[in-house]
């Protein structure tokens, strides 16, 4: 069993904001493979099967800073024993250039409150992350910046990278995280 988590904030107000790039990736994954999310408890959920692997995809509705609450519920329900290889979290990264994708096996939250919430809730830093750079505006407060929408020029670039992130998920599932890191961390 694999659990994929796209991080973001629920509601129309946040739908197109930089902080919701994790939601955008799992929405694109669902669109590409004909999956439909259903609301359940503190998250939206859909199930997928790829290469004989059962996969659960969620979008927490707890708001970013409490994402760990929803993730822990799903992890406990699905009884993930091999956590590092079984949990994939997709999120934005303000410290990376716009559109840069970086896949990591584990590590700190890097200041991302949604990731920190997951670390705190699960009691481990050992899970796969797909980080997508959203850039940074030195003239704008970080919290204001991440909650603002992409410009139309940025949107075109980020859409291309969202598709790459979906491809990277498939590589992780089919060929492993090391192969995905070798491919996508170089781009």
Swiss-Prot record:
Coiled coil: none annotated. It holds the Pfam family Pept_tRNA_hydro. SUPFAM superfamilies: Peptidyl-tRNA hydrolase-like (SSF53178). Its EC number is 3.1.1.29. One of its GO terms (biological process) is protein quality control for misfolded or incompletely synthesized proteins. It is an enzyme of class 3 (hydrolase). InterPro entries: Pept_tRNA_hydro, Pept_tRNA_hydro_CS, Pept_tRNA_hydro_sf. One of its GO terms (molecular function) is tRNA binding. It is found in: Cytoplasm. The record marks 9 as: Discriminates between blocked and unblocked aminoacyl-tRNA. The record marks 92 as: Stabilizes the basic form of H active site to accept a proton. It catalyses: an N-acyl-L-alpha-aminoacyl-tRNA + H2O = an N-acyl-L-amino acid + a tRNA + H(+). TRNA binds at residues 14, 63, 65. NCBIfam families: pth (TIGR00447). Hydrolyzes ribosome-free peptidyl-tRNAs (with 1 or more amino acids incorporated), which drop off the ribosome during protein synthesis, or as a result of ribosome stalling. Catalyzes the release of premature peptidyl moieties from peptidyl-tRNA molecules trapped in stalled 50S ribosomal subunits, and thus maintains levels of free tRNAs and 50S ribosomes. PANTHER family: PEPTIDYL-TRNA HYDROLASE. This is Peptidyl-tRNA hydrolase.
């Amino acid at each position: 069993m694999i659990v994929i988590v796209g991080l973001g904030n629920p509601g129309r107000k946040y739908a197109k904001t930089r902080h919701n790039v994790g939601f955008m990736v799992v929405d694109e994954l669902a669109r590409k493979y004909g999956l439909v999310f259903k609301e359940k408890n503190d998250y939206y959920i859909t199930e997928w099967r790829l290469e004989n692997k059962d996969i659960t995809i969620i979008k927490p509705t707890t708001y970013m800073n409490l994402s760990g609450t929803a993730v822990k519920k799903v992890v406990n329900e699905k009884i993930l024993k091999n956590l590092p290889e079984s949990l994939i979290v997709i999120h934005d990264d303000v410290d990376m250039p716009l559109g840069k994708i970086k896949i990591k096996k584990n590590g700190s939250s890097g200041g991302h409150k949604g990731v920190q919430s997951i670390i705190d809730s699960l009691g481990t830093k050992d899970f796969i992350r797909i980080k997508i750079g959203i850039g940074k505006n030195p003239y704008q407060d970080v919290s204001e910046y991440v909650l603002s929408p992409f410009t139309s020029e940025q949107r075109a670039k980020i859409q291309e990278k969202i598709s790459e992130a979906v491809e990277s998920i498939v590589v992780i599932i089919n060929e492993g995280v090391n192969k995905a890191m070798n491919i996508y961390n170089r781009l």
